[in-house]
Every structure is written in C-alpha cells, then in structure tokens.
Amino acid sequence: MRILFNHNISGAADLIDLMRRAQPGLHVIATHERRDTPIALAADRLLPEPAETRLMSPDAYADWLLQVALAEGAELVLPYRRREELAGFRDWFSARGIRLLTASDSNTMGFLEEKPAFLSRMEAAGVPVTPFRRFEGADEYGRLRGEGELFPDHPGPLCVKPASGIYGAGFRIIRDELPAMTPLSGLSALELPDVAFQALLGALHRPEPMMLMPFLEGPERSVDFSCHEGRLLGTVTRIKAGTSQRLLHDTYGEELARFVAQTFRLTGILNLQTIEDTAGTQRLMEVNTRASGGIGMTGLTDVNLPALFLDSIAGVRSDLPARVTGEVQAGRRELFWGV
C-alpha cells in the first residue's frame, strides 16, 4: 500500500513506524514545510509542502494535495493539516481512485475541536466532564470572577485554557495569591498571578474563546484509540507518572472511547484525555481528531493501534477491541540526526 501524509506533527514518524512494523512493504510519502522534520526518518519519500499552501483556498489546497497523490501513486491519504476542510473533498479523491480518510465530516470535526460545545454534549449524555465556564477577554473574565465561588464541588486553584488548540498551548494555573516573598524563579512557567493574567487579557487586541476551570490535580490519562466508521478497534491508556508514563488497559477509558467513537461515527487513530477529581472520578477533558504526540509510546505494548486501523480499512477486524495485557512504564530521550 502507498500512503500519503500531508504536513503533520512529529509524532507522525512514530505512527509510520508502527504501521510499517505490521506491514513492512508499506510505502509512505509525506509532504512537509521543513526538511528537518523527524518524519523524514520514517517516510520513504519526503516532498516539500510550500509555505504558500497555507494561503490557498480550501479547494485549491485540496487540488494541490490530490495532484501530489496522483503523481506519487498514493492509494490512501491521511491528512493532518487542514483536515477539517479536506473532509469536504473526499469525493474528489475517491473519483480518482484514492481514499482520503478523516476522523469524520468537516462539521463534526469542528464540533469536536471546540471543547466547550463537545463537553456540554457529553455532559448531557451523562459523561462526567471537567467543569468549566466559557469567557472571552478581560471583561468577561472579570465578571466571572466577580460571581464568587464558581465550582463549589471542586475548591482550590483555578486554571484557564483556550477553547480549542493542541499541546496545552495557552494553559495556565491562576494563583489568586502568592506566598509572601515568592521570587519569580519560584513560579512554574504555567503559573500566573490573577492580576497578571487580567493584565495580559487586557493587552490582547483579539480575545479568543477560553475556558475557566478548577485545577484538578488527580491522575491524568491519555487514551489513544483506533476506530473505523464508529467501531472501536483497540485502546492504550497512558498515565503520566512524573517524567515517565505508565501504559496499560483501562476499562473506563475503553468504554469512553467506544462511546465517543460510536456517537460521532469516528475513523482514525485518535485520542481522548481524562483527569481524576478528588473523589476519584475520571472526568473527560477533550477528544482529538488526530493521533496524539505520544502515540509512539503505545508501541511498547502488545496493541498496535495503527496496524488495527490499516487492517480494518482492508476489511480485517476482530469482534472485540484489542486490549493491553500487563503494564509498561515508558521513558523517553531526545533523538538527533543529520539533516
């Protein structure tokens, strides 16, 4: 099989390695803006994705990617960049004998990436979610804080994060008061005094939708899962443990992944995240319509999520989702190579 990836996060290199572990004859073509991407180590062929493609209209970009796929003889296209838009052009690709697979249609993916809307939908369905209040800009934030105790069931510090985004960009822990004589070096990069956060909001010319939440300090789980047309194929749960992560089977994580996949009829190697509150309840934080940056760690278990996905689109699947046996603790190190 010949697969084309467009511009992607570096974790796609691990995704490709896991696919090739199951299918050694796989031929992978990747387009990317940078020559120094780790994907260059995993792909058979790396092609430039010019920066100007960012400025293309949706149909122009879809046509550009289609022409690359045709020129390279790709049978399957798995997009990351502009995937929400590309979902609307799947018929263009299928008309030329190429499968373009996205997590869902454009509207559904957009909905899933908007955390407040998604969490409200899940809460209405009975799923425990992280409590939140949505706001935009300094004035709305100030009004929220003026309401007093916003989350009485979850006392303690508050935190904020953008309503959409990846890698925790924009996440901050808000400190209403700092201990006396606290030096700047005594704060983590994620901590902000409330007065500093309000000043920062006031300095921004374009406020973005954000979420104000209780800062829950329980175990955080990242559930990587593979699914095809709403059917769950397998899961691997990762629990952060200091500088390493524990990889194992989590029954609730599997149930949640199955529910999300079925509800939105999802396809792909995707990810969801939960965090425990003080009562030990796992609360859903978000779902990602892409593979996580930590997908490579799942290769240390006996469940190969990318392989399950490739098998399923070829018509080969099990009646039950694959489950990790045992537990693995994963560390990581930097990788260097000459470009």
What are these regions (language model features)?
Residues 184-264, 275-283:
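Phosphate-binding site of ATP-dependent enzymes
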